[in-house]
Amino acid sequence: MDRVCIIRVSTAMEHNPYEEPKTSQIKDMFGIQDSSDGSDLIRKFVVAETEPLEIATLTDNGYVLEPPNLIVPAGTVVYDDIPDDLARAVLGFPDPSDKGALLLGNVVGSSGTPVALNANVVLPRHVLIVGSTGTGKSWLLGKIAEQLHERGLRMINIDIHGEMNRATEQMGGKVYVPGKDLKVPLSSLAEPEILGMVPVQHDLHIDILTKAVINLKAGKTKFGIGDLKSEAIRVGESYGAKQNTLDIISARIDQLGQIPFIGQGLDWKAALSESGTIVNIDCRMLPQSQLQLVVAAITRDVYNARRTGAIPPLVMAIDEAHLFLPATDKAETATVLSQLIRMGRHIAFGLILVSQTPGDLDKSITKITNTRFIFAIEPSELSSIYGALSDAPPEIVKGIPRMKSGTCLLVGNRETVRHATVFEVGGRSTHHGGETPTMLQ
């Protein structure tokens, strides 16, 4: 076949001289049937504004796509539909039957092309999901979780609102509640985090405690409250501290035992041993200060386990991501999550960030995510990620705040999503916990 130019219609407007205001008014006055539905009117036509996307050539090995570097001659025949396999190639979607294809929904429009993303390409380069409350973010996250489960990929979900609990159990996964059946070892916390939990103010006490933490961290082994107390006493004695000073420091360290989420820690190798395991961390009961510490510790443990090969490739999803990667003050989680985002691709560890206020997210992190799902969102929030909308036409971007629930704009770089497209998220087989309840019966 000859080369064909694939174009995207941005806007369309009908030109119908038979239905101008004056003639339409006269027809109404005399009861003459209008011609708005006529399809065989000689002077009636539609003007469409288009954008060339790709030049496609069919070969024995499929379609070869090239940048649109030719001028389409006037009078060239235009087809209003293209074959499904060509549409997938243009958008960068794999065949839905491929083993690594994540089936998420269908493109909005007459073609209804299935939206399938290549898990091996998309997940290691990280994903961003944004949208206002009730627009479909949690529905999509649940859909992705189902697809990962079906394909045998492990997933850890940091669930701020407890929305994935029931769905996790339906998929045979495990729900953990920090402070109840999930604790984090003291050694998984960073030095400033540990010092911030021990109520010491005297300079000598702070120096002794800091040195003790540094020594234990240098040992690169797991340690707990008892280990910290023993090391602090040893350091204090080497400083020539009096017994009452050592007693005060010991008493302060003992108070760490009252923090409910400090403990032995979870065996992540065992928790993620089965193919397709979903682990949901229900963080509803954690106050903001503890939430930061728990998520930071979990991320460090899982990252180190994956880096050393102790656990298989996996995906971690984080709801309300702006709490952990803020645009202004650095949270406890920012350092470790930033490291994961930079290094995740090299160790097969993907990250999915979900937020209803992307303007509060660290801008550098937003840019690093290679695949983005944009649901209906306020214009002020949309402007904060305007530079991350790839080649989405201005007309589509303008309509994002008015998108219906469950419909989103999908964008990415050329490796993940070749061209921006609007699609409707498909159905789910598990419970949706993010549904807005009815206030009046």
Predicted regions, residues:
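Hydrophobic residues in beta-strands of the RecA-like P-loop NTPase core, especially within AAA+ ATPase
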Residues: 158, 318, 354-355
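Glycine-rich phosphate-binding loop of nucleotide-binding enzymes
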Residues: 99-180, 363, 410, 441
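Basic- and hydrophobic-enriched, low-structure N-terminal and domain-boundary segments
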Residues: 1-130, 144, 309-312
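Conserved P-loop NTPase motor module
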Residues: 271-272, 405-441
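Conserved nucleotide-binding/hydrolysis micro-motifs of P-loop NTPases
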Residues: 13-15, 54-57, 161-165, 181, ...
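P-loop NTPase motor domains
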Residues: 161-162, 166-169, 173-176, 186-341, ...
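Alpha-helical scaffold elements adjacent to nucleotide-binding pockets in ATP/GTP-utilizing enzyme cores
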Residues: 8, 143-144, 163, 193, ...
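Conserved ATP-driven motor cores of ASCE-family P-loop NTPases powering translocation/secretion/packaging/pilus
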Residues: 39-40, 197-200, 341-421
